[in-house]
Amino acid sequence: MLQNTVRCVSKLVQPITGVAAVRSKHSLPDLPYDYADLEPVISHEIMQLHHQKHHATYVNNLNQIEEKLHEAVSKGNVKEAIALQPALKFNGGGHINHSIFWTNLAKDGGEPSAELLTAIKSDFGSLDNLQKQLSASTVAVQGSGWGWLGYCPKGKILKVATCANQDPLEATTGLVPLFGIDVWEHAYYLQYKNVRPDYVNAIWKIANWKNVSERFAKAQQ
């Protein structure tokens, strides 16, 4: 599990090799739009806090944990390396999930590609059925977590899945993440209060189908 999480985190940065090389640090990605661009579905205030505070905290914590892990491994301290696993998974997953989430959203997200729409109809019957199934599963997440549309490389099918907390989809299920819905309360509470279904149903209005379609095409390669 730890190896899978590390592998997913490593995809976000360019690996640096060599004994004398300086290890790269993770950084907070810029958003491909302004904080107010997703209104009225998601407010400027939520977007700014979510990005600058919550995601930034995952990035900072992840860098600190990786420093500690590097030190533990270099000293052969297996006990310390194991003790760092939960924090690595949580903060690494938070960075991975949010980096996908931002690109999954857009003011004018368009429509699924012909190839993706064909797959959706094959696996769910219709786009409407997919939206209903993913929305229902996401709303039903107990506590904090994520709802996902993922692609199963082995079965070559689309699947709906949920993950608790910040567990990264690919590292924990083997599904390639295509579209994610964040249902941590910080993602919606300032605007939607305790009515999670309203937030989940509204997010489809800003789904970036171009990005989802590109992820689907890449996942099949």
Swiss-Prot record:
Q: How is the cofactor bound?
A: Binds 1 Mn(2+) ion per subunit.
Biological process (GO), any one: removal of superoxide radicals
InterPro entries, per this entry? Fe/Mn_Superoxide_Dismutase, Mn/Fe_SOD, Mn/Fe_SOD_BS, Mn/Fe_SOD_C, Mn/Fe_SOD_N, Mn/Fe_SOD_N_sf, SOD_C_sf
Q: Which residues bind Mn(2+)?
A: H50, H98, D182, H186
Q: Which PROSITE patterns match?
A: SOD_MN (PS00088)
- Please list the GO terms describing molecular function: manganese ion binding; protein homodimerization activity; superoxide dismutase activity
SUPFAM superfamilies per UniProt: Fe,Mn superoxide dismutase (SOD), C-terminal domain, Fe,Mn superoxide dismutase (SOD), N-terminal domain
Superkingdom in the source lineage: Eukaryota
Keyword set for this entry?
Manganese, Metal-binding, Mitochondrion, Oxidoreductase, Transit peptide
Q: Which reaction does it catalyse?
A: 2 superoxide + 2 H(+) = H2O2 + O2
Cofactor(s) demanded = Mn(2+)
User: Which Pfam families does this chain map to?
Assistant: Sod_Fe_C, Sod_Fe_N
| Family statement | Belongs to the iron/manganese superoxide dismutase family.
| Protein known as | Superoxide dismutase [Mn] 1, mitochondrial
Q: Which organism is it from?
A: Caenorhabditis elegans
The root-end lineage is:
Eukaryota, Metazoa, Ecdysozoa, Nematoda, Chromadorea
This protein's encoding gene: sod-2
